[in-house]
């Protein structure tokens, strides 16, 4: 990628397409420590995209499995004491083997859950933090308690906090919203594709965290990985909505379109834009 302030959109679109081609070829193994509401949908999203899910979320196996996985997702949507131990163990295993892991801090801002997230971050910094604006604000200590996926803070209000997290953890931060913002220390890209029904189906946002971990497993530039995952899910959401009567059919069509969409269409239709300051 070019230096700060010179993100070439043609090159970026090509890198997104190439990343999807590589994902489908290499079939990265993704360990998912995710919430009980979305586990099945998340696994199907990964399979249809071309990755291999492994829902290994117990403390006895998590650390060892993270060391052999290509990418790891830690999602705090429904934390229990045993699974929180597994999350910390997975972060430790990922760090010891340089496996990229993605944090999706669902509901951060509630006291115990925030402590779990911070304890996990103390073990190892993630490759990517994927969250909504309210979660970014809460994680940075600049917002109130989170309502999780239903939180209503504007993405633009969380950009300063996202920059703070980027600097503190040395990671990429991807903020989901009507327009997604993805930034690291040098670059800031937006993705403006997608469809409103993405918020009407349980698990779409959580599956984006898993998809980001899959791309991070095959793409060393983690900003490109996050942009690729976001663009892919948003483009297939548009395609799925075009042939669906409502959210139920949309959820099924979304899984189909992840399998059917071409890499070039993801790169070209993603609505990518450089907004690096």
Swiss-Prot record:
UniProt GO BP: thiamine biosynthetic process; thiamine diphosphate biosynthetic process
One Pfam family cited in the UniProt record for this chain: HK
Pathway as given in its UniProt record: Cofactor biosynthesis; thiamine diphosphate biosynthesis; 4-methyl-5-(2-phosphoethyl)-thiazole from 5-(2-hydroxyethyl)-4-methylthiazole: step 1/1
Family matches, as HAMAP family: Thz_kinase (MF_00228)
Binding site for substrate: 55, 203
Gene3D superfamilies in the cross-refs: 3.40.1190.20
Major enzyme class: transferase
InterPro entries according to UniProt: Hyethyz_kinase, Ribokinase-like
Record's protein name: Hydroxyethylthiazole kinase
Similarity comment: Belongs to the Thz kinase family.
Protein's organism: Cutibacterium acnes (strain DSM 16379 / KPA171202)
Catalytic activity, EC: 2.7.1.50
Annotated function: Catalyzes the phosphorylation of the hydroxyl group of 4-methyl-5-beta-hydroxyethylthiazole (THZ).
Keywords (A to Z) from UniProt: ATP-binding, Kinase, Magnesium, Metal-binding, Nucleotide-binding, Thiamine biosynthesis, Transferase
UniProt cofactor(s): Mg(2+)
Reaction catalyzed: 5-(2-hydroxyethyl)-4-methylthiazole + ATP = 4-methyl-5-(2-phosphooxyethyl)-thiazole + ADP + H(+)
